């Protein structure tokens, strides 16, 4: 478990040591009406909002990385979710990476988070607020067993499940990525109220946080939405396939060259960086 915790911490801080991308040279949001452009893994944003770092309901981690920008819809979602969590006595919501001031590609750690519609939220809800030192170097709490087959009972709580459910029930949310073991636990605990589980999608890693994705805003005409998740709660064969051993001969896919930017994003870079 210690090795896994170290690996998680390394994953959260590794991006600081990698070569910068052109998008990191844009230090303030691009003025204009808010527009998410392109796809979640190949896009940008005009008119991003800054998430206020001071709030009674949430705390923002790693503010030195300046990844607390997003579409106004994302900022409002975070404020809405954290207010609901506070009303229910769940604890302080810990906000991780959103996006950069103009969106675009990160130098590591994320393939998406490019259009201002994604946010990582820690799956721990402290009852006392974290210090500035804790926020700058957050300790991820690994909720998943070493073999990846189930959550760690001593670390899992109904409050965590409630936070994920609250996020999934938000009308602006289309997907929430969590580790397969976390999805499995949610399936076991959900009871008869299961419609929200459709949005909770199993994905690699995500052992200590959930990755929340919003739908494209109606007035962002160049934003590319994903297809909706398949019908149903996603607790059947699809989920179980994540726990099966890899088929013989299965290899990791090779890293692909990033696709060309959407023309509007390339024009934005040309004007503000290149």
Curated annotation (Swiss-Prot):
Residues making up the signal peptide according to the UniProt record: 1-19
GO molecular function: metal ion binding; metalloendopeptidase activity; serine-type endopeptidase activity
Annotated region (Disordered), positions in chain: 225-274
InterPro entries referenced in this protein's UniProt entry, alphabetically: Hedgehog_sig/DD-Pept_Zn-bd_sf, Peptidase_M74
Cysteines engaged in disulfide bonds, as pairs: 44-265, 187-235, 216-223
Subcellular location per the Swiss-Prot or TrEMBL entry: Periplasm
Organism superkingdom: Bacteria
EC number assigned by the record: 3.4.24.-
Keyword Zinc belongs to the record: yes
Cofactor: Zn(2+)
Assembly mode: Dimer.
Function statement: Murein endopeptidase that cleaves the D-alanyl-meso-2,6-diamino-pimelyl amide bond that connects peptidoglycan strands. Likely plays a role in the removal of murein from the sacculus.
HAMAP family: MepA (MF_01623)
Listed name of the protein: Penicillin-insensitive murein endopeptidase
Organism in which the protein naturally occurs: Salmonella typhimurium (strain LT2 / SGSC1412 / ATCC 700720)
